[in-house]
């Protein structure tokens, strides 16, 4: 009898208090639509159903059940994407309890960022309020740091946010030796030796993964190695390997490793990508550029070498996307793209480098990156160019759901603007 009562009460709860996650139909009317992948629609409508873009254009049928948003005078853009961040894995640098980005040891390719992402991170709301709706959240620290996850910036728990788990494996390429000018010969030898050993470990691990892949294909029984098993799709070219690099020498070294082991490589960081732009184009390797606001790597470089790198990559024909990096700085992603426009990057290319291009590089362009029928409805509606500092996001949709623009920043503003 109690079981029947429980079932009845459960049924009544669903009828009287429907789950908030149930999809609703929305219509954004009279809005300028920058599709990014096609022509801009001067004035049209966007229909959102079941979390996706169902229709768009100047003459579409809008169901009477749709919740209508009149966006006259505003512009719709696809939600922006940062293709290499630490959002959800780190909160406050000085508080170790909020850090879940590093694991001990050098070989952690089996560690998944999705297992540690904090959906309630303050960085989530702050970042999306500036129009960034999707990020790649990546581990750091180790040589093989782990597997990154692509998430939408809305959801109660990680499962709600997850767009693609195990999207790429992060490999922190051994850094060039950088010592002060007064370093002695022994210090230089020790540093070079340490770097050489890390390169040897990188190659050995990838060779072992290739051997392990052959055993897996042959269905040979034996003890399972979690780290090597996680690298099987990487050495088979089924999962991208994101190499973090900065100098031209590091970029060349990572490209050599990618060629040697036939990896599907993506380069992240790339402060000196401008030095090897033609090489990157010839290798057809995409770049996630995150050094725009950094100082030049050499005192002999021009002051604007980093600011002009996106223009140099674009001119050379290198597919690239912007990455603000870290967690707290991701909110500045659109403004970094805007700054690059001031140093020679075409304005349309800058917009694509924070929308369509990162989606293509991360192999999620069938879901996000542009405003097209059938794609996930990640849409921002602004009162101006989203790459300009004085523009504001007025409405935000993530996975077809309107999302509040409140954040820790707006809460603090509201609190202290009332101060007597």
Model-derived segments and spans:
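His/Asp/Glu-enriched, well-ordered alpha-helical/loop segment
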Residues: 92-93, 98-104, 109-110, 240, ...
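Divalent metal-coordination and catalytic microenvironments
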Residues: 31, 46, 51, 73, ...
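Metal-associated gating/positioning segment near the N- to mid-region
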Residues: 74-141
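C-terminal cap of metal-dependent C-N hydrolases
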Residues: 31-34, 44, 372-416
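Polyanionic/metal-chelating signatures
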Residues: 123, 128-265, 392
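Bacterial N-terminal signal peptides
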Residues: 8-18
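Histidine-rich, glycine-flanked metal-binding segment
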Residues: 33, 37-77
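Boundary at the C-terminal end of the N-terminal hydrophobic targeting segment
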Residues: 21-25
